[in-house]
Amino acid sequence: MSPTTTSLRSLSFSLYASSNSTPISTPIEARQLLSSCNRFYGLSSSSSSSSLTTSSLIGNLVFSSRNQSLSVKVQALAAETEQPKWWERKAGPNMIDITSAEQFLNALKDAGDRLVIVDFYGTWCGSCRAMFPKLCKTAKEHPNILFLKVNFDENKSLCKSLNVKVLPYFHFYRGADGQVESFSCSLAKFQKLREAIERHNVGSISNISSSASEKVEDSSE
């Protein structure tokens, strides 16, 4: 037999064997590749699997922690949004928000001889915000006095016509006397507002009792 014939038969047998052999499955190849990598890096399959599991757990914990933190922030923001803004809070029925010049004039007219205190404020005004809780307390102590709140930004034409140039600013009105006093005030000078109330709310029973309580409060401060 010639070498050429032997070579052709060997090639034919090799091709036949190749076409009829069962291919190695992909999972087996993957496992073999992973095993080779582990041997190269000196790791066992179990330690590699353990490392992957630990990494997954840590990743899940971090993701869960971030989700919880985000959830808390969202809940806090929602609670803050639901609460009224500081300027939206009212001390009682004797504190009214003014939204127009017409409403302002009608409120003064309907008050009769009742003392009316107008608070001109801005939502952005830090001094207005600082003294507002004390103003609300004063309104509760004087239910006979009508307090009107005027938002400067929403009633600019009204404020301009009344010559309001600084905030917070107060106007005092009483019956036929009209405007009896006006001044700027702050938390540090809140006593100025109390003294004006004593001057213009003369004869009121609630004024006498509240003045006594204010003196006690001042002596304790």
UniProtKB/Swiss-Prot annotation:
GO terms for cellular component: chloroplast; chloroplast stroma. Keywords: Chloroplast, Disulfide bond, Electron transport, Plastid, Redox-active center, Transit peptide, Transport. Residues 74-202 form the Thioredoxin domain. The active site is at C125 (nucleophile), C128 (nucleophile). The keyword Transit peptide applies. It is found in: Plastid, Chloroplast stroma. GO terms for biological process: detection of redox state; regulation of photosynthesis. Its main location: plastid. Thiol-disulfide oxidoreductase that may participate in various redox reactions. Possesses insulin disulfide bonds reducing activity. This is Thioredoxin-like 2-1, chloroplastic. It comes from Arabidopsis thaliana.
